Regions:
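Glycine- and aromatic-enriched mobile tails/lids
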Residues: 1-204
Length: 206
C-alpha cells in the first residue's frame, strides 16, 4: 500500500488497489524502457537460485506439518479475521492491541504445528496456495497491530481511545507522527524495524 493501514485506513488501501489499474500501465513500461538493453537475469544466477530455494523451503515446511489437531487454512483465516475485527478495528486501545498481538502469535504457532494441506506440492494445489497466503496474513495481521500500538495518536481511521479531545474527537499529533511507517522484519522472532518517511502537507489547501 502507499500509505498503510493505520492512518488513513481502508480508504487508502482501496485507493491503492483502484489507482493501480490506471497508473501501472503508464509507470511500469517507463521503468522497463530504461532497462531494455540490459542482460536478463539468468535462471542459474545466485539471486534467482536463492529466491527459488527460499520459496521451495517455505512450501516444504508447510507440506510437512503433521500435527495432532489438524485444521485447514480457512480455520486459521477465520480466527485471524475475528481477532483483527475485535482487537484492531477502527477504535483501538492499548490493552486490546497487546492482547490481540499475543493471540495472533499463538494462532501462528498453532498454524505451523497443525495446519493440514492435502494433495501434493507439485500438483495444481489451491489449498497449498491458500495456506501460503494465510501464513502471510498472520504475519501481516501481527504487524498491523504492532503499528497501531506504536502509533501513539488518533488520526483518520486509526482511532486510539487514549487520544481523544475534550469533545471526544480524534486527537492528532502531527508534531511526532506526521510520517509514513514502513516496516521490515528484524533478525529475531517477533521483531520488526520501523522506517519513517515524513509527510509534507504544505501544498494541501482546504
Amino acid at each position: 500500500t502507499y500509505h498503510g493501514a493505520n492512518r488513513l485506513g481502508a480508504n487508502s488501501l482501496l485507493s491503492a488497489s483502484v489507482d493501480g489499474w490506471f497508473t501501472l500501465p503508464f509507470t511500469i513500461p517507463n521503468y522497463l524502457a530504461d532497462h531494455l538493453n540490459e542482460d536478463k537475469l539468468a535462471e542459474d544466477s545466485a539471486e534467482a537460485q536463492e529466491a527459488v530455494q527460499k520459496s521451495q523451503e517455505r512450501i516444504d515446511k508447510l507440506m510437512q506439518v503433521h500435527g495432532d489437531d489438524p485444521h485447514g487454512p480457512s480455520h486459521y483465516h477465520r480466527q485471524l479475521g475475528d481477532l483483527l475485527y475485535f482487537g484492531c478495528g477502527v477504535s483501538r486501545n492499548v490493552e486490546d492491541l497487546k492482547d490481540t498481538i499475543e493471540k495472533i502469535r499463538a494462532l501462528r504457532d498453532d498454524f505451523w504445528k497443525n495446519v493440514r494441506i492435502p494433495g501434493e506440492a507439485n500438483d495444481m494445489n489451491q489449498v497449498l496456495e491458500y495456506g501460503l497466503r494465510v501464513a502471510d496474513y498472520l504475519d501481516l495481521g501481527e504487524l498491523m497491530c504492532i503499528d497501531a500500538l506504536d502509533r501513539d495518536e488518533s488520526c483518520g481511521a486509526h482511532f486510539r481511545e487514549d487520544h481523544l479531545s475534550e469533545e471526544g474527537e480524534a486527537e492528532r499529533d502531527d508534531e511526532n507522527w506526521c510520517f509514513v511507517s514502513a516496516w521490515e522484519p528484524g533478525e529475531n522472532k517477533n521483531e520488526f524495524i520501523r522506517h519513517a518517511e515524513p509527510l509534507y502537507l504544505s501544498l494541501i489547501h482546504i
